[in-house]
Amino acid sequence: LIYKKLHAGFSFAGLCLRQNSGFAFGLMLPSQTRENRENRLMEMKRVLLKLSGEALAGEKKTGFDEDTVKEVARQVKLAVDAGTEVGVVIGGGNFWRGRQSNAIDRTKADQIGMLATVMNCIYVSEIFRSTGMETEILTPFACGSMTKLFSKDRANKYFRQGKVVFFAGGTGHPYFSTDTGVALRAIEMEADCILLAKAIDGVYDSDPKINSNAK
């Protein structure tokens, strides 16, 4: 996978065959031309999109940048209207990063992060709905009337109904990131690919925000 920084004007890349300068994410398939990659993406029936919480905040760094989220919704709608089944996993970094807190127990810190992803999914889901898409939010733990409990059968039913399915709450367990969560859900849902929008421009051997020598 190739990671590109999300900002205003990004595009859903090859999935919708739309190209804007500074696209946010895409699938890189080795030894294939751009045309072949785009054709491959168009053949994919079900994809999972992973958005970092920081990506939703835009230049604000915290909370939500509504223009950015609306642009995400616009691009996803292109894919949905083309017949692609889209699932969404969102991080919680625009509200909370448990690994950066030394004051509380790691398990509790990660639980706060899981709840942050639920808030993000509720917000983004409503923006998606404002464009005419139908959505459902699933969590691996009960959240009252706000979400529905995840099951593979339930998610598949929503996909078949043409709904965008939000997978909130990560894996439901501490010590696992939402990047792990999207990989888990992709396997369970038999997705054709994962598309990631991250706040970094590549895959590194250590955190480039901390280690300037990261490779």
Positions of predicted regions on the chain:
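Polybasic, lysine-rich low-complexity intrinsically disordered segments
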Residues: 5, 20, 33-39
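A charged helix-plus-loop insertion that forms the helical arch/lid used to bind
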Residues: 96-119
